[in-house]
Amino acid sequence: MFLQGLVLLSFVYVSTSTTSYSTSTSSCNKYKLNQNRCLENKDTETGEQCAYLSCNEWPEYACEPMYGCEIATYASSICQKNPSYTCHYSSNLASNPFVYTEEALLDQVTDLPGLKDALSYNQFSGYISLPGTQKNIHYWLVEAEQDADLKPLVFWTNGGPGCSGLIGFLTEQGPFRPTADGEIQMNPYAWNKVANMVFLEQPVGVGFSYSNVEDDYKIGDDQAAKDNLATILGLIEKFPHFNHSDIYITSESYGGHYMPTLANEIINYNDAQEYNAEKLNFKGFAVGNPYTDYYSGVGAEMETYWGKQLLPKPLWDKYVANGCTTIEQQLNNSVCSTLILNFMRKIGNLNPYALDYPVCLSQQQMTMRNYLKAELLEKGESGLLSADSFDIPYEPCEDEYSSTYLNRADVKAALHVHTDIEWEECSRTTKYELKDKMLPMEKYYKILLNSKTHPEMRILVYSGDDDSVCGTIGTQRWIYDLGFPLLEDWTTWYVDGQTAGYISKFKTPYSKDSRFTFMTVHGAGHEVPTYKPKEALDLFEKYLTNAI
């Protein structure tokens, strides 16, 4: 797809009109340009771009083998010998073996307001313009703290639907936390300790992402998957040194729809490519507390309340006797709806997304709550739950530090985003298809895990067990109903000698090892890294290194 050159210096990149090469001061060695495979600057086996130069043309510089073609490497003085090459320097870059395109350097974040300490890694923020559209998706890339060239490339997006990936950046697993005084506090459990992280604001209309076409803000699962794939491809085009990196996608909440549909889109894209070099090196996805199946997932919310002993036994017995444990009965049986209303009154003012934590719903939680509630409210005229049934005084608690910080003019300038866009955690501009919430995602898991062409792809579903809405009971239900045989059932995993949760592994075709894992995180709410940051980082690293 894109040529990845051999890199020996960290602060220089050399570009032509078509590609970029790395620099070296070593003398010419024994390698010769393979004329049999490299015809018309194309590798006949892989289709990759070949070097323009050979040792014969520039005998004082080395030629190195790369993917079957010999890549010419040369020192920056070549720019003086051949004016068709241009050298670009950035003294702000942290040391690493990457070579950056001019477009990438324009997005480099060199002076982040409130950040006092020098970073050992680079960060970039800007837009990926989607081909053939007027859609512009905002990304924020933070490289791995150490050995970035050896670490995978991981994309993160939040749920909602319609909530910003910068929620994850600033309140969950990103490297920074804005404070009340406008400073930046470092997160000791940031996920870029083990990966190059890209935080996306998608779909279009979310956060700083925008389009000049009003209809683009009407979107559903299928189009979101296509746009997210285009965003990944666009980012790798801007940062071609990631072309051969292992790629993972991650999310939570409505990511239970985003992740399997995007993974399926990537698989289809890869299968359509003629050359292996054009394929994404896709390794799988991880999703936390996923909204996967409206019926098996949401229907388990009341069971979680009972399991937490938040309900009296006589009321629960009546609920079971009337068959109310299925979502179908909850939606269509007036007795069940009345019992649910009684449950909510008995429970009182608790946060359903983090039952053992103070009452404080984030915007992402509120968005999911309203999205799921819509189905019940539509039944109001039939005698089921109506709008006034949800008069429990939940208080939204948008992270005001994040909103205040991101809406500062100097921060917007540092991030290279449109200054006239008012950043919100969850979009009021994006019009997401309500019908998509009823679509079960299990079929995608079966397609992906039965894929012959991608046996290396691994899926991790993790669940904070203090969440009732996208909780562990419902998640277990749909996972076990997939029918994959167990390899390992409910074993304990530990952090600092303490029980962090439980692991179940499933046998899938075309692999002797487990490609499908379920993990619980004990005591974590809906956004696992917010409530259990150390455990979340441990889980994430185990997944990336296949150490679960």
Segments predicted by a language model, with ranges:
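Terminal and linker regions of secretory-pathway proteins
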Residues: 2-5, 11-23, 87-548
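Intrinsically disordered, low-complexity serine/threonine-rich segments
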Residues: 5, 13-14, 18-29, 49, ...
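Intrinsically disordered, low-complexity regions enriched in serine, threonine, proline
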Residues: 27-29, 34, 103-105
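Extracellular Cys-Trp
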Residues: 30-33, 37-58, 62-74, 78-90
